[in-house]
C-alpha cells in the first residue's frame, strides 16, 4: 500500500466501455442484494421488543435542568447521540470520531416530519461542551448527562463510549427501542459512504485494496490532521474560537 501523499499511486486496469459496464453490472447485482438485506435488517429493528427507561432521568440543557422526557420536545421518538467528552481538555483533544459524525448531522426537518427528535447527550459538563458545540457551529439540541444519569441511560453498556440510542414516548412513559456503538454510528455519516464509491475508498490500512493503493501514513489517526480533528480546521480558518473556557483545568493527558 502506498502513502496517501505519494505521486506513484496504483491504478486499475484500463479497459473498453463494454468490459467496464459488464464488470459494473455484475457488481450491481451484489449492491442490490446488499440494499435488500439492509431493508430486511431495518424491518427486524421494527419488530424488536422494547424496554422501559426512566423518563425523569435528569439532563442539563440550554435552559438548565430538564428530563429525558423533555428532550423529546413533544415528539413521539427521540434519537440521542452520546458524545464522548474529555473534561478539562482543549478542543483539539476532544473526540475526533464524535466530532466527525456529529458534524454530518445538519438538516433535521425530515426527521421532525416523521415525529423524531434528534439530540446530542454529551458525557461531560454542559457549559464546557456547549462551547464546543458553538465552536463547531452545530445547531441540534444539546444536553449534558452526568455520571448518575449515564448509569441509568447506558445501563449494561460502557459509559464514555459513543452510542446511538433510540427511544419511544407513549404519554409520560419512555422506552428504549434500539442502540448501537462503534461502527454502528456510521449511520450518521455520509463522507465515508461517498468515499466507499471511489476507486481508492477510505484510504485506510484495514481495507482490502490492491497493492499500490494509497492509505494514510502508519500511526496517523484517520480522523485527525495537524494535531486536531480534521473537521475543526474549517471552523478555525473561518475565525471561530475554540476556547472552551477550561484552560485552568488543563493537565497533560497520555495518548494511547
Model-derived features: positions:
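Short loop/edge segments at beta-strand edges and connector loops
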Residues: 122-123, 144-146
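Catalytic nucleophile loop
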Residues: 113-129
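Non-globular targeting/processing and membrane-anchoring segments
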Residues: 1-114, 131-137, 141, 148-256
